[in-house]
Amino acid sequence: MSHDTAAGDATAPGDETLTVYTDYVCPFCYLGEASLEQYRAERDDPLDVEWHPFDLRSNERGPDGEIDPAADSGKDEAYFEKAKENVRRLQEEYGVEMSLDIAREVDSKNAQQAALFVREEYPEAFAAFHERVFDALWQDERDVGDPDVLAEIAADVGSADSEGAEIDTDKLRAAIDDPEREAALKGRFREAQQAGVTGVPTFAYAGHAARGAVPPEHLRRLIEG
């Protein structure tokens, strides 16, 4: 859970693409999405954006890959209270309504695996699915680690997209349980670490990066110089 504005070492895959490293369970990532949308709305030219998953709770996972309730996250109550204070400040600054009462036990791994599936198989629906997963957690307080919730989101996105094919929710459920897709997701997590990403959100563009829910003007400087 990061909210500082320090530059990092992460690099984007292409000079004209903004890579956003993010995790659905991070409130600052949700706020960062809002800042990015404000910046994109102010731009004259379109901006290519690539989502890259990041495992914010990697140090809490057991050998089976699941969250271990007994694991020490290294964060105490004072940390979480300070984080909430920062979230509230940014909510007001960016005009974002969101709940801070979600369970800390929510695991985003299934959501990120489902999102990779949607991006690969239904690319025209990815942006809407990605947004709805964030909204489901931070607006509706739903457990986005639940395959039923993810299937419902996929069905809603597909039915609302008149230009693309509806997302096959049976295939989405199968993708969540697919060991090969899980291995691919873990590979993306490793790529983020190898790129020097240590916190989220991280925005990377042309060899430069900004970390945290930075305001639109910071994104403008990152991208436009």
Language model region names:
Residues H3, Y21, V25, E33-L47, ...:
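C-terminal cap of thioredoxin/glutaredoxin-like
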Residues P13-T19:
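Extreme N-terminal starter segment of soluble prokaryotic enzymes
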